[in-house]
């Protein structure tokens, strides 16, 4: 890949940051608002998105709790942020298993903020913006190891999706010419 292509791919992850638990709306959001908020956080990443029907299915399957008076809470938003990322590499059954594990050890706020920290730690590394990745604590439990593995897998999938999107854009802009220039 050319240097310009690599720069455009890396741009997907530059300055990426998720809102922390306390920064998520404290008032309930309707389904469309919930989907819009989650998708806005991952706008630069093709494939990391939710639809209203997906969210409704997660509720029906019991992966997240039912909305209260048709409004989704901060805890449900946090769960949906994680689902948006992990659904690209895990089955719903495995996502639900990880949710159950984290609930045994951490509050929703702790688990979500740790997820944010890990994603923000791994993305720059996978996208080539940083040469190291912060190590897990020696006493990290199984749930943290599984989360790290999920995030590294998802970050690699996010990288590939960005790379293919850049390649398709370049081919659309310069059909046939790129091959001649190579």
PLM regions: where:
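Basic helix-turn-helix/winged-helix DNA-binding cores
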Residues: 1-103
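Intrinsically disordered, low-complexity, charge-dense segments enriched in Lys/Arg
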Residues: 101, 105-182
């Amino acid at each position: 890949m050319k240097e310009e292509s690599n720069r455009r791919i890396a741009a997907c992850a530059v300055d990426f940051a998720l809102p922390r638990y306390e920064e998520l709306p404290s008032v309930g959001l309707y389904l469309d608002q919930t989907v819009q908020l989650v998708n806005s956080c991952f706008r630069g990443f093709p494939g990391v998105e939710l639809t209203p029907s997906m969210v409704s299915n997660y509720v029906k399957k019991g992966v997240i709790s039912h909305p209260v008076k048709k409004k989704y809470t901060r805890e449900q938003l946090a769960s949906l942020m994680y689902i948006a990322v992990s659904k690209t590499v895990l089955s719903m059954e495995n996502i639900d298993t990880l949710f159950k594990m984290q609930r045994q050890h951490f509050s929703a706020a702790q688990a979500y903020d740790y997820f944010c920290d890990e994603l923000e730690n791994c993305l720059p590394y996978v996208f080539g913006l940083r040469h190291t990745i912060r190590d897990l604590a020696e006493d990290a439990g199984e749930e943290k190891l599984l989360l790290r593995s999920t995030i590294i897998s998802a970050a690699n999938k996010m990288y590939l999706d960005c790379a293919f999107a850049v390649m398709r854009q370049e081919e659309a802009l310069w059909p046939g010419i790129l091959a001649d220039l190579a």
